[in-house]
UniProtKB/Swiss-Prot annotation:
GO terms for biological process: axonemal dynein complex assembly; brain development; cell morphogenesis; cerebrospinal fluid circulation; determination of adult lifespan; determination of left/right symmetry; heart development; lung development. The gene is DNAAF3. This is Dynein axonemal assembly factor 3. Required for the assembly of axonemal inner and outer dynein arms. Involved in preassembly of dyneins into complexes before their transport into cilia. Pfam families: DUF4470 (PF14737), DUF4471 (PF14740). The keyword Cytoplasm applies. Keywords: Ciliopathy, Cilium biogenesis/degradation, Cytoplasm, Disease variant, Kartagener syndrome, Primary ciliary dyskinesia. The keyword RNA-binding does not apply. It is linked to Ciliary dyskinesia, primary, 2: A disorder characterized by abnormalities of motile cilia. Respiratory infections leading to chronic inflammation and bronchiectasis are recurrent, due to defects in the respiratory cilia; reduced fertility is often observed in male patients due to abnormalities of sperm tails. Half of the patients exhibit randomization of left-right body asymmetry and situs inversus, due to dysfunction of monocilia at the embryonic node. Primary ciliary dyskinesia associated with situs inversus is referred to as Kartagener syndrome.
Length: 541
């Protein structure tokens, strides 16, 4: 609902970046059982991880970059998102991170990563890279054999045929099938969304951004975010200004999402920006660092900004990930590369090759049906659930986690629109859902206001009932706004989609969109009953 003071929907209904620091998933998973059967093909123990709403791949990249510090394992990352644009961004970001160093240098790769990932506007060279890479991916998606040959780390086999078609359409839009900035006028869309969010406070938006930063984000542990960079992002959508401000003028099409809206009594397909305009992309890589000197203060003020810390962390992350390319090129010289990277222990295996991990994308809306497949039931050693997907934490999903497996739930700590009492209510609700799904709090887990950590109890929780939301639990409507609240007027959007572009998955009727989180969590268990499961290729999981 929109009020004169604004909609309060800064979180948006589509997530483009994470609202928590990147995790090393190996550090969060149970220790390797030495008696467990290793993968017969690769002769290494496997780590199977299911991630709901991880959005930007930061946890996966962090895990891969830290793999050299752990015994060698094969990773199977199963990623489930609620929109295909997020899947496409995963693929683009990973293809960039795994780009051959000979084709793109480390600095260029890190700068391109930051701009594509967190900026609403791009420099022309970065936009050209997005178009070229999107064109390549658009040709690979319909051809599984070529896709497996060129991107051996990627698996789309679980997606439905219509989802693959829609994914191809997303890449073709990014590649410039519809020419000109008028196809996605990002600056106008951003301003329209900001006006809708702030309402009568729009003219005082600088004061609003300073208040949100100092009284909310700084108080919650993100002191390194500088007022100038936060204000610039709130005004323009440009979080990482690595060049002169005039260089950023090409709309970032990877932030576009399609949707069916009601316009004068008719359903109209339109593209727009419905992502975050409140917190920003600074939290994922910008508020923590392995190098403690980046976080030091002088006269009570941080010496580095969140943008500078993000650039340093991403550069180091991509430097570590590039070891796979060198390992593949040099064949067997892994020991020398390990010592060159400075591993802490001589006996620790070197970083794995690209073929030692696979990213599997699961069909949209398949969380309630995964347990019907024997290949998923009790398979995963680690389950990660983002704060916007907590309503999917049900006993059926818990059945997919192996006994003794761990659960990590992202909390709403860095959501600007959430008040302190709402945070406490959300944390309580997370504990209730985790317990109903068969999990118990981890014993000895370090205290955290950002993540809730649980482990799978031995008893099955499939027969449990998720309790209804108690009257005292505050509603968290800002986590998943209905379309009427989160979308600006249709006149503020781009032109309607043309009939030649498939949009069956990215565009959803308002009745199919997620309601407020409290409404979803309060549904009786029968309303969440999964339909019958059919074949993966035709109907998905």
């Amino acid at each position: 609902m929109t009020t004169p003071a604004g909609s309060g929907s800064g979180f948006g209904s589509v997530s483009w970046w994470g609202l928590s620091p990147a995790l090393d998933l190996q550090a969060e998973s149970p220790p390797v059982d030495p008696d467990s059967q290793a993968d017969t093909v690769h002769s290494n123990p496997e780590l199977d991880v299911l991630l709901l709403g991880s959005v930007d791949g930061r946890h996966l990249l962090r895990t891969l970059s830290r793999a050299k510090f752990w015994p060698r394992r094969r990773f199977n990352f199963f990623v489930l998102e609620n929109n295909l644009e997020a899947v496409a961004r995963h693929m683009l970001i990973f293809s960039l991170a795994l780009e051959e160093p000979e084709k793109m240098g480390l600095q260029e790769r890190s700068e391109t990563f930051l701009e594509v990932w967190g900026n609403a506007l791009l420099r022309p060279p970065v936009a050209a890279f997005v178009r070229a890479q999107a064109d390549l991916l658009a040709h690979l998606v319909p051809e599984p054999d070529r896709l497996e040959e060129q991107l051996p780390w990627l698996s789309l086999r679980a997606l439905k045929f219509r989802e693959r078609d829609a994914l191809e359409a997303v890449f073709r839009f990014w590649a410039g099938g519809e020419k000109g900035p008028q196809a996605f006028p990002m600056s106008r869309l951003w301003d329209s969304r900001l006006r809708h969010y702030l309402g009568s406070r729009y003219d005082a938006r600088r004061g609003v951004s300073d208040w949100d930063l100092r009284m909310k984000l700084h108080d919650r542990g993100a002191q390194v975010i500088h007022p100038q960079e936060f204000r610039r992002w709130r005004d323009t959508g440009v979080a990482f200004e690595l060049r002169d401000s005039s260089a950023y003028h090409v709309p970032n099409r990877t932030l576009a999402s399609g949707r069916l809206l009601s316009y004068r009594g008719e359903r109209v397909a339109a593209r727009g920006y419905w992502g975050d305009i409140a917190t920003g992309p600074f939290v994922a890589f910008g508020i923590e660092a392995d190098d403690e000197s980046l976080l030091r203060t002088s006269n009570g003020q941080p010496v580095k900004t969140a943008g500078e810390i993000t650039q340093h962390n991403v550069t180091e992350l991509l430097r570590d990930v590039a070891a796979w390319g060198r390992a593949r090129a040099t064949g067997g010289d892994l020991e020398e590369q390990q010592h060159a990277e400075g591993s802490p222990e001589p006996g620790t295996p070197a970083a794995p090759t690209p073929e030692s991990f696979t990213v599997h994308f699961l069909p949209l809306n398949s969380a309630q049906t995964l347990h019907h497949k024997s290949c998923y039931n009790g398979r995963f050693q680690l389950l990660y659930v983002a704060c916007g997907m907590v309503h999917l934490l049900i006993p059926e999903l818990g059945a997919c986690v192996a006994p003794g497996g761990n659960l990590i739930v992202e909390l709403a700590r860095y959501l600007v629109d959430v008040r302190q009492e709402q945070l406490q209510g959300f944390n309580t609700r997370v504990r209730e859902l985790a317990q109903a799904a068969g999990f118990a709090p981890q014993t000895g887990a370090r205290p955290s206001e950002t993540f809730a950590r649980f482990c799978k109890s031995q008893e099955s929780a499939l027969g449990n009932t998720v309790p209804a939301v108690e009257p005292g639990t505050p509603p968290l409507d800002i986590l998943a706004q209905p379309l009427e609240a989160s979308n600006p007027a249709l006149e503020g959007l781009t032109q309607p989609l043309q009939g030649g572009t498939p949009h069956c998955e990215p565009c959803q009727l308002p009745s199919e969109s997620p309601g407020s989180l409290s409404e979803v969590l309060a549904q009786p268990q029968g309303a969440l009953a999964p339909p019958n499961c059919e074949s993966d290729s035709k109907t998905g999981v």
